[in-house]
Amino acid sequence: MHCAKCLAAWLLIPVFAAWSQATPPAEKNWKAVCSAAKQAPVRQPDLAGPLRPSQLPDCHVQQWYYGYGIRKPDYAAALQCAWYGRAHADPSVGDMFAGAGTLTMLYANGYGVPRNYTLAIRFACEEPWAADAEQEFRLGHLETMRAGRDTKPFDLCDDVTSGLNMGACQAVSTQQHTGSRQAKVDAEVSNLPSSAKSLFLALRGAEKAFEEARAGNEIDMSGTARGMFYEQEMDTLAAQFLINLQRFHKQDVPVATAADLQTLDGKLNAAYQQLMKVPASKWEDYGTIKPEGIRETERAWLKLVDAWARFGHEAYPQVSETSLRAQLIRLRLHQMQSLAKMLAT
């Protein structure tokens, strides 16, 4: 079994790392449960605020529910947004959090409304993008909570089994990290000399271009879990960018001589050439990962290294350009070697 396909069995287990702690009991008769749950009419409550009616068409329910970008959750706003989303559902958009999805969480947890498991189950049954296995686990989870055997907060991501919804959950996890990470980046930049600050925007742009190239070209995007893998890689790269800022600031990188740099550069070039020489037939087993994508990513990385060198000269004069470039090469070499190892299996 090739590496690009070895996660297939794992993807069927509802153990999304950021949320789920144990596999819940499954409701094998979930279709009958849902059929009964949908019989009772549901009336939207009168909601006075805090969002104005004009804000509802563009509201982002995940932002209000999870609180990323606004410091803390606002369940009253999430409730408004979710009810609006349910009333204006777009069946062509695969968003499990839209409308009924977030209503499931709000009513299951009693966030912004009295806890109501009957409604939570009803809304869970309205989710059109959930796999059958996902519904078995989700309905079983809610029934376990209603019976008082599970008191932990409920989240849709506890029970995901499909690649599509794993991607949605990873996107939430990434967004939750982004706010705190950005605050740390801002803190690193705030004390830099103005000459460095003027170069930071260009560095950030080069970093973004590399992150998108790396995640889009060197991670297999062919499976249903592609969204999750893409978001995971973007999160990893963003975390590494912050680590780089912190380590260069603290001078916490190995001192490299010109000879060291030449050796590392030679290793990187050898790894790159090895990948470029892999027969075309070999790449067929690895989905969207192709030599041309690696080449595009490498070009973006070279621009990023140059941007780091210009920025580092002003921001970290105590760190030699040789040491800075060597550290960046080490990180890229690890990525190249991981690709080569994948192809060798």
Map each language-model feature to its residues.
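Bacterial N-terminal signal peptides that target proteins for export
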Residues: M1-A8
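Hydrophobic h-region of N-terminal signal peptides that target proteins for export
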Residues: W10-Q21
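N-terminal alpha-helical modules
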Residues: Q21-T345
